[in-house]
């Protein structure tokens, strides 16, 4: 799976009316997540949960979105994907306050960070980008399935992956090592591993839950976000080269 030309998409025209829909977007206070919420809010959903760690930053993002969409119904959802306890609390908040869930967008992520582990002992990128989202999805699946069983439903799980999944270790997912910092493995390979896990997870979800449309989406290599904020400037210069190499050295998944 390599890079390919994208399909022309006009959010104002191509997103349908979302009246009555309930949506969860992780990492919604900045970058892709914030823009996603902005575009969805234009189409009248009943509620959008903005997953974020900081209530202050989320409040700022919500205020800025409402400058463009004054009637946007956006609710802050406190969530730290590096903490299973936080993810469970966030999921319970959704389940206790909403009778339906139409769209789950697992957008939040970190990239090429220094070696570390999550609160629960997983390699930080694998734990944040994959394990946190996998747990959130599992906990919300009963509500997603319930909604999918309703007439004329269109329930979706969108996982933000990346063509950088091709940078994963040549052995694939090193599952015997993910409960450690994996400091001897390059940070780029660890990022690729987390993105490869996103792709595998999405494929399995699609098999197990045919009533739910499950897709893994590569957002593009020239999208302006702060995901690379932890990188040194010299490392940031390598990002375009990594995506170029994906075109020529992609491995199938």
List each model region and its residues.
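C-terminal helical subdomain
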Residues: 194, 216, 240-253
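A short C-terminal helix-loop "cap" of Rossmann-like NAD(P)-dependent dehydrogenase/epimerase domains
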Residues: 180-181, 234-245
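Rossmann-fold NAD(P)H-dependent dehydrogenase/reductase core
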Residues: 3-232
């Amino acid at each position: 799976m390599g890079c390919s030309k994208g399909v022309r998409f006009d959010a104002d025209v191509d997103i349908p009316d979302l009246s009555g829909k309930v949506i969860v977007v992780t990492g919604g206070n900045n970058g892709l997540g914030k823009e996603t919420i902005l575009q969805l809010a234009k189409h009248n959903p009943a509620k959008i949960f903005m997953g974020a760690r900081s209530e202050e930053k989320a409040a700022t993002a919500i205020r800025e979105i409402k400058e463009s969409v004054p009637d946007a119904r956006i609710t802050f959802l406190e969530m730290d994907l590096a903490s299973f306890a936080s993810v469970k609390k966030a999921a319970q908040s959704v389940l206790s306050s909403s009778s339906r869930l139409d769209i789950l967008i697992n957008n939040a992520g970190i990239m090429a960070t220094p070696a570390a582990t999550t609160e629960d002992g997983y390699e930080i990128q694998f734990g944040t980008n994959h394990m946190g989202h996998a747990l959130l999805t599992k906990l919300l699946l009963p509500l997603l399935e319930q909604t999918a069983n309703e007439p004329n439903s269109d329930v979706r799980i969108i996982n933000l992956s990346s063509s950088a999944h091709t940078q994963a270790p040549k052995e694939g997912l090193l599952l015997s090592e993910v409960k450690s910092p994996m400091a001897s493995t390059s940070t780029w390979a660890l990022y690729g591993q987390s993105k490869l896990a996103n792709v595998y997870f999405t494929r399995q979800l699609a098999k197990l839950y045919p009533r739910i449309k499950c897709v893994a989406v590569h957002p593009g290599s020239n999208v302006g976000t702060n995901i690379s904020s932890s990188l040194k400037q010299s490392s940031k210069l390598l990002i375009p080269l990594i995506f170029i190499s994906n075109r020529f050295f992609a491995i199938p998944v």
